């Protein structure tokens, strides 16, 4: 039986709620049965331990490092096969211990990581810029199975505490399924209206909208899932980064899990080349300044949150510092690259040559060649700093813009007893879904607090926090890298919160540097009237001609 769709173009606004209820009447039973498939009243948690696989690697990483070091002072290219035992002993220790670490960066290791928590990934693995990851998406992959990190039982996390922990995780998954079912009618109705779906629409078009509606529903429902939820990824790092990660395993909100995962990565490398670690004796730092400082002060999570939010003034992202002479410095830098005088190229002309996509083909590149283009490097000299507040799940994606680094909180030092979370717009527009969502938030914080009250370490208790947990951070980037980020994240396909933050940031840029901001917008805005295709998303086109009225066009989903 083919689903029936209605076009909202033919209904006055006051009928929308009635139409949503009508949609629910037709679709809820089928949707619920599909989305709740496999659900049980009290599901057990699949808590398989982290699994690390070394997928690709250098055969002789240590000898390659020594050969690279020798090449600096040799009359020919030194190969790993030419390295002697004496050189391994003398050159290896001399370069490593004196801080000449670039030679250990040539060797790279590609790992497969399974059954690791999203808390570990956010708090540690992706908290620095020197890596590459392809991670399983919660936005578009339905989380059917209850899979999450569960710490081993010990003196501070006994069986009764573990029961509270696992029940909270199982309950979160139930809320996830319930919200998925409650929201799909809303997402379907909005998408049907955007794409003008009617009874006579092409069945394949209708099927595509149905798939998209389900993805949009689970994208919002995932906000209730715990940060303990498992994820899977391919993760590639250099040899020196692996050394640094092992040294800093205590520097996160999940030190125990971190030690387990990074320790397994080190062990995998040692199996292929024991010298790469054994020669230097790198060991984890046990006492970090962050924890030492925290031990002498009282926790003030609520007070910190109130103070930070007051400074934001209701914004998602607020400009707190910037290069006041950005336009002139950029223009001077552009002229320096091309050897021009100010009489030959004025400030406004330099800015236009750099940022106008009709005059600078680099702006139309999807390969992001900015750092390789001599003239685009002029944008490196203007910097902007933002204070922002987004959810854990949004920040997990936002932090992937590694050239726009942020100072993110140690949640164990900024914990709040009261629920502190972000609510997506779609939930605010559905009273029933919002009620379920708020109950899920209360339950998550109650379980977390119950563990803390039992003496369970914050490291463990905070795994129960939901994806929606508010993250307050400070982020800085040069205009070069912010330009790339804003181009990608002002697209309607960008994650809702990151889109909102980016729009706030572009608005702030417009306030202080309007001569720069007029060139900023999503790919379609940049490309319209200059090249084709206007939209670079292909079959994932959002359905809205954003380029006709950016930044005034309204995003509905």
Please report, for each region that a protein language model flagged, where it lies by residue.
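A conserved ligand/cofactor-binding region detector
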Residues: 29-557
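Short, low-complexity, charge-dense intrinsically disordered segments
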Residues: 1-4, 8-9, 13-23, 32
């Amino acid at each position: 039986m083919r689903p029936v769709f209605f076009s909202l173009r033919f209904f006055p606004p006051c009928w929308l709620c009635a139409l949503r209820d009508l949609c629910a009447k037709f679709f809820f039973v089928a949707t619920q049965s599909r989305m709740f498939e496999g659900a049980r009243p009290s599901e057990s948690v699949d808590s398989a331990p982290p699994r690390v696989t070394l997928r690709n690697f250098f055969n002789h990483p240590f000898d390659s490092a020594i050969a690279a070091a020798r090449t600096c002072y040799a009359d020919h290219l030194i190969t790993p096969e030419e390295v002697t035992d004496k050189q391994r002993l003398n050159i290896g220790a001399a370069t490593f211990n004196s801080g000449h670490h670039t030679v250990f960066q040539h060797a790279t290791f590609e790992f497969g990581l399974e059954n690791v928590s999203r808390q570990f990934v956010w708090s540690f693995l992706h908290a620095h810029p020197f890596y590459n990851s392809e991670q399983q998406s919660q936005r578009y992959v339905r989380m059917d199975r209850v899979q999450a990190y569960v710490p081993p039982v010990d003196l501070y996390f006994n069986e009764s505490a573990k029961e509270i922990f696992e029940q909270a995780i199982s309950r979160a998954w139930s809320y996830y399924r319930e919200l998925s079912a409650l929201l799909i009618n809303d997402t379907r109705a909005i998408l049907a209206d955007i794409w003008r779906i009617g009874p006579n629409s092409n069945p394949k078009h209708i099927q595509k909208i149905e798939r998209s509606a389900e993805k949009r529903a689970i994208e919002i429902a995932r906000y209730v899932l715990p940060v303990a939820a498992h994820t899977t990824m391919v993760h590639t790092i250099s040899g020196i980064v692996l050394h640094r990660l092992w040294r800093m395993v205590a520097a996160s909100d999940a030190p125990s899990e971190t030690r387990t995962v990074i320790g397994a990565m080190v062990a995998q490398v040692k199996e292929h080349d024991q010298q790469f670690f054994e020669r230097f004796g790198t060991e984890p730092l046990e006492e970090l300044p962050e924890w030492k400082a925290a031990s002498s002060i009282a926790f003030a999570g609520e007070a910190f949150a109130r103070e930070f939010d007051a400074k934001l003034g209701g914004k998602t992202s607020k400009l707190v510092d910037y290069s006041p002479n950005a336009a002139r410095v950029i223009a001077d830098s552009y002229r320096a690259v091309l050897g021009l005088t100010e009489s030959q190229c004025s400030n406004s002309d330099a800015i236009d040559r750099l940022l106008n996509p009709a005059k600078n083909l680099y702006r139309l590149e999807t390969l992001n060649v900015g750092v390789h283009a001599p003239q685009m490097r002029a944008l490196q000299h203007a910097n902007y700093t933002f204070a922002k507040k987004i959810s854990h799940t949004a920040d997990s994606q936002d932090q992937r813009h590694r050239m726009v680094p942020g100072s993110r909180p140690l949640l164990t030092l900024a914990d709040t007893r009261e629920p502190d979370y972000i609510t997506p717009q779609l939930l605010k527009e559905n009273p029933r879904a919002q009620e379920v969502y708020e109950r899920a938030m209360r339950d998550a914080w109650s379980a977390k607090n119950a563990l803390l009250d039992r003496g369970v370490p914050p490291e463990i208790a905070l795994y129960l926090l939901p994806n929606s947990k508010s993250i307050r951070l400070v982020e800085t980037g040069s205009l070069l890298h912010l330009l790339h980020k804003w181009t990608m994240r002002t697209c309607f396909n960008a994650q809702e919160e990151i889109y909102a933050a980016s729009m706030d940031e572009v608005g702030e840029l417009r306030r202080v540097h309007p001569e720069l901001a007029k060139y900023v917008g999503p790919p379609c805005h940049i490309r319209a009237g200059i090249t084709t295709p206007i939209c670079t998303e292909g079959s994932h086109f959002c359905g809205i001609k954003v380029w006709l009225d950016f930044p005034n066009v309204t995003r509905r989903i």
